[in-house]
Amino acid sequence: MEPNVVEIATPPAASCSRIRTPTKAETPEVIDVEEYDLQNGGVPNGNNVDYKNKGKAIDFDSMSYGDYGEEDEYAVGSPGDDYGYPESSPLSNSLLDPESLIYEDDENYSEQYDFEMEAEPDNYSMYQDLFDGKDIPTGVEVSMDWFPNSADKESASSSKSSHANNGNNSSKKATKASGIHSQFSSDMETPVAQPWNALPHKAEGVIPNSAYALPQNSKAFQPPYAVHYSALKTAFSNYLQPQTPDTVLGEAPAPAAGSSGLLPPNTPGFKSNAARFKEEPPILPPDDSRVKRNMEDYLGLYLFFKRFDIVEDFSDHHYASKGTTSKQHSKDWAKRIQDEWRILEKDLPEMIFVRAYESRMDLLRAVIIGAQGTPYHDGLFFFDIFFPDTYPSTPPIVHYHSGGLRINPNLYNCGKVCLSLLGTWSGNQREKWIPNTSTMLQVLVSIQGLILNQKPYFNEPGYERSAGSAHGESTSKAYSENTFILSLKTMVYTMRRPPKYFEDFAYGHFFSCAHDVLKACNAYRNGATPGYLVKGAPDVEENSAGMSSLKFRTDVATFVETVLLKEFILLGVLGLEPEEEEKTPETIIVAESSKCTRSRSKRDRVSSS
């Protein structure tokens, strides 16, 4: 059946940069409807191609979509179709467009299309003139796409759109990669590089050989903060004190002169070390939403707090991520851990409390109460322990809850515990971990006796030789003064954020010892030295250690009045507020009976149950 045809007058010729010479006489054309649509950007059905695309079509090879046969054709338009060949609009086609720099001969045009074309201009000369007019810097190369966009690259010089011809595969110049790229050309546009006029070449402030030519005065190159070594050193000294001389601990490395510029100034969470220590101190500002605690909520649980117990939730443990609950350990390893539990449950000293985890036998948590006569008196010091798979051939791993404070040469502010028994410090063979002989109980007792002692300054190797000398004792006293201030801060840190399963113990402990701590601070404010035995100790005038420094006395008084006293009041400690001066004798008895000198028989009875 003959297709329906319509006789249409020839439309006026559109302006074009090149003139086509039809192969037939200029007579009214008789075309079908599909041919008419073709002239307006439609799909060609034969060898004819729409006039908008300058008589060029793209040949798809065998790697085109599998849904179409070799004779199927489809086309996609693009905004680039509105422009003519580069002469019509010099900026319409970017010089960085990879399709605009493909030079191929045009000798087969007359064979592929049904109309004749005038002689094509010399592509090389045309683009050479175009490049010369753009004032491109010497040595700059135009980026080229690795995978060509089509089989006949000369067809993409102006339109950036893809049209299929009648499936003629006569051209063998297209690579297989071109077919791969053509599959996706109908779904997305080929990315076009940034035009040269948008790049600030030959401008001041541009970094030479920069990939993106960012000006040096751009905000991206400005340091996010000003770092001064003096300020950084002061910030570290405030939070890492006390410290032994630099010959032992080493001086903190000097900060960089500025930022690398990789992060913008206002990137969330981006802080320097100095800013982190200044803005996030261990002692956080008081929370106005906190309310005064009722001692009845925790005091009873504190009095019957077991010395050793097995609990469930290990989520806040420092080494919680080192293993899983489903991990299967060897029978020998599990048996050894159970032996450690039995030893701890039976032989723990009075001032050490331990919690094990039922679902994670490799984890342990312990708290040590600071002994009287030391700068650590009445404080609580928490440690997280991890038993590796190689235990007991290798020692356990211990982390101290420092809160960012370094209270001892062997307890780093990062949480590291420096001890020969743990393999974190050198020592003779008898001081190191001995497999199948050393125990976790030895580790805890060593921390209590060797680290949290009366004169922690002499914990550093070599410093003990200065003990007894005027210089050594003077330096040790200054170190102990700083240690006690940090111990007070650790108390506040623990009261505000006690570790899980130790909340009632921490509240009850500081409730019972609050008056003793305040009494000791009053003695220190009057000149007593740290570690001075307040309970039953002689007066300050009879203290053989001499007077404490003026700075220490001032620091103690300031911290107690501004921080510590308020924390004790929020804890519910009695007798610290003016309205509590008049109390009944029964209330006084309850407060006094809950001090640190709890009944030893009651503690042992609970532990043995």
UniProtKB/Swiss-Prot annotation:
PROSITE patterns cross-referenced by the UniProt entry: UBC_2
Q: Which UniProt keywords apply?
A: ATP-binding, Nucleotide-binding, Transferase, Ubl conjugation pathway
The pathway this protein participates in, as annotated, is: Protein modification; protein ubiquitination
**Short name of one Pfam family:** UQ_con
Q: Which ranges does the record mark as transmembrane?
A: none
Q: Which domain of life is it from?
A: Eukaryota
State the residue spans of region: Disordered: 70-99, 151-185
Which residues are in the UBC core domain? 332-492
Record GO biological process = protein ubiquitination
Tissue expression, as annotated, is:
Expressed in seeds, pistils, siliques, hypocotyls and leaves.
Query: What is the active site of this protein?
Result: C418
- Which reaction does this chain catalyze? S-ubiquitinyl-[E1 ubiquitin-activating enzyme]-L-cysteine + [E2 ubiquitin-conjugating enzyme]-L-cysteine = [E1 ubiquitin-activating enzyme]-L-cysteine + S-ubiquitinyl-[E2 ubiquitin-conjugating enzyme]-L-cysteine
Query: Sorted alphabetically, which InterPro entries does this protein's record hold?
Result: UBQ-conjugat_E2_core (IPR000608), UBQ-conjugating_enzyme/RWD (IPR016135)
Residue stretches of biased makeup (Low complexity): 156-178
Q: Which GO terms describe its molecular function?
A: ATP binding; ubiquitin conjugating enzyme activity
Q: Identify the SUPFAM superfamilies for this entry.
A: UBC-like
As recorded in UniProt, its EC number(s) are: 2.3.2.23
Family membership, please give it.
Belongs to the ubiquitin-conjugating enzyme family.
Sum up the protein's function in the record's words.
Accepts the ubiquitin from the E1 complex and catalyzes its covalent attachment to other proteins.
Record-given protein name: Probable ubiquitin-conjugating enzyme E2 25
Organism, as annotated: Arabidopsis thaliana
List the taxonomic lineage: Eukaryota, Viridiplantae, Streptophyta, Embryophyta, Tracheophyta
